[in-house]
Amino acid sequence: MAVQKSKVTRSRRGQRRSHDALTGPTLSVDKTTGELHRRHHVSADGFYRGRQVITPKGE
């Protein structure tokens, strides 16, 4: 069993946990359609940075 050498204070425990918070996805507005999409990701209709890079499966 792992046993700590000394007690971890509330302050040190909080400092360690300070980087654990979750952040929401960063969203941008598509130039061509005006839809929201995740930054640096291809949108649902296949556009990336204003030009079509893939054709969607539905077409």
Curated annotation (Swiss-Prot):
Stretches for region Disordered: 1-34
GO biological process: translation
SUPFAM superfamilies recorded: Zn-binding ribosomal proteins
A Pfam family this chain is assigned to: Ribosomal_L32p
Keywords: Ribonucleoprotein, Ribosomal protein
Matching InterPro entries: Ribosomal_bL32, Ribosomal_bL32_bact, Ribosomal_zn-bd
Gene Ontology CC, one term: large ribosomal subunit
Single GO MF annotation: structural constituent of ribosome
Domain of life of the source: Bacteria
Biased composition (Basic residues): 7-16
Family label: Belongs to the bacterial ribosomal protein bL32 family.
Family annotation (HAMAP family): Ribosomal_bL32
Protein name per the record: Large ribosomal subunit protein bL32
Phylogenetic classification of the source organism: Bacteria, Pseudomonadati, Pseudomonadota, Gammaproteobacteria, Oceanospirillales
Gene: rpmF
